[in-house]
A protein has these predicted regions:
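Accessory RNA-recognition modules of RNA-modification enzymes
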Residues: 1-204
């Protein structure tokens, strides 16, 4: 539990309903959701209330964003019609308890965006940097998008046995810090590297 340093969640105006909810024929009203995609149902999102994959305050932060957005009438993404405002939320942390928050927005709504960002920055002082990207594409890939920094430096740092890593919104970094550290240490042990050896990283 609580081993991942990076989690990505999707906004949707089509919350996944259980078979019980469907058979009840109740009118559920608001169907906005922030969470995970349902396997085999690309347009449906499981509205997460609690996730055991990432440390606190991940749950509180995600729910604060969700509840603020619903309360203030912000449009959750409609993947079928390709419209809406809020698209994805990425939460990333380092081992020092500092957080990066990344929003993907389908369109720009400057006033709504700034009010949402200011709200969570005030509520969660653990946030070291907050970044966002406008993504009107058909997919959620961020690598060809222009990421804007709203707060902080636009990245966080991680350290492993004297090595310092600069991690940005597009960076790949092992999602399990403790196991990555064990892996690096075991690799050094197997390699039997001395202080006089020259080491080449051929896979960067």
């Amino acid at each position: 539990y609580f081993y991942r340093n990076k989690m990505e969640f999707s906004f949707s105006n089509a919350r996944w309903l259980t078979q019980y909810e469907i058979s009840s024929e109740e009118n559920f009203g608001n169907k906005d959701a922030l969470g995970f995609h349902i396997p085999g149902m690309w347009s449906k999102i499981l509205d997460l209330q609690e996730c055991f994959l990432q440390e606190a305050p991940s749950n509180d932060l995600r729910l604060a964003v969700r509840n603020y957005a619903i309360k203030n009438g912000l449009d959750f993404f409609d993947v079928r019609n390709q419209e809406g405002f809020l698209r994805t939320l990425m939460l990333r942390q380092n081992s020092q308890g500092e957080w990066m928050v990344l929003f993907q927005l389908y369109r720009e709504e400057k006033e709504n965006r700034e009010q949402l960002f200011d709200y969570i920055l005030e509520k969660f002082p653990q946030i070291k940097t907050l970044v966002y990207a406008i993504n009107p594409k058909q997919n959620d890939s961020i690598y060809d998008l222009d990421v804007q920094t709203y707060f902080g430096e636009g990245f966080i740092y991680e350290e492993m046995d004297g090595l310092k890593f600069k991690i940005g919104p597009k960076s790949f970094f092992q999602t399990n810090y403790k196991q990555a550290l064990n892996l690096y240490r075991k690799t050094l042990e197997f390699a039997e590297i001395s202080e006089n050896d020259v080491v080449y990283d051929l896979y960067t």
